[in-house]
Amino acid sequence: TNSITIENPPLLELALNANPTSCSNTLDGEVQAIVNGGTGGYIYTWDNNLADQDTHTGLLPGEYCVTVEDANGCQVNDCITVGSPPELIIESITFQEVDCNGNNTGSATVTASGGTGNYDYLWSDSLAQISATAVFLPAGTYTVLITDETGCQVSESVTVTEPDLLEINFDATDALCKDESNGSATAIPVGGTEPYEYNWVTGSTEATANNLAEGDYDVTVTDSRGCQAEANVVIGEPTDAVALTLDQTEQGCFGQSQNEAIALPTGGTGNNYTYQWSDGQDSQTAI
């Protein structure tokens, strides 16, 4: 009688190792399948359509599963997760508008979360500022780059605005007659930030300055942010005062009503004169 001893191959065992990605969205994760036992000639079948090999690099975060089969068809399987640090994100980015057109009083502030450790900041302004808040900014678009302690980065842009340039238009009325003070001027601001304050050279603090004689008048307009504009308006007057010449055009006999007189005005404004005679007549010619 003969006997034979049938020996089992060593137990097929599988262990998985994983290295996390350096950042939440980088392709540098790694998995490794470590196999012991069984009967050589291992075949690796990964669920993620990865190649038949024990180690894979350049991976995104996520779960990776593998089935290992030896030369005898024995199988073992397991899964492992390639981790990552918390995603570095920008929670908010806000700005403070420039106070007056053309100034550099704007600012921008960024708030970030996630990532690893402390953050470094770099703004795209002319000063290349390196804090969470960039100051002394003129109007424009700025980008901030945030880097955490492992080198992960995120960036975002913000546009710092400014009010329109404060300017002054006028609605002016000339003096009606030469050497009179009945002209007026209204300052009409555009741009800046309402409400406005007015300071005329005459001392008036209203939008309209009244009782103006012929001449130049300066006004300063200040908006709600302290921005100022200065401008000048000219009040005119007729070139000449109204002058009147009377002429007798018809002469009748003594005691009769055949006399006729005509008024001949010059100067003033335009040719649309009105007349008032002492006897009540209101035409240019009195009979």
PLM segments and residue spans:
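Proline- and Ser/Thr-rich low-complexity, intrinsically disordered segments
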Residues: 1-287
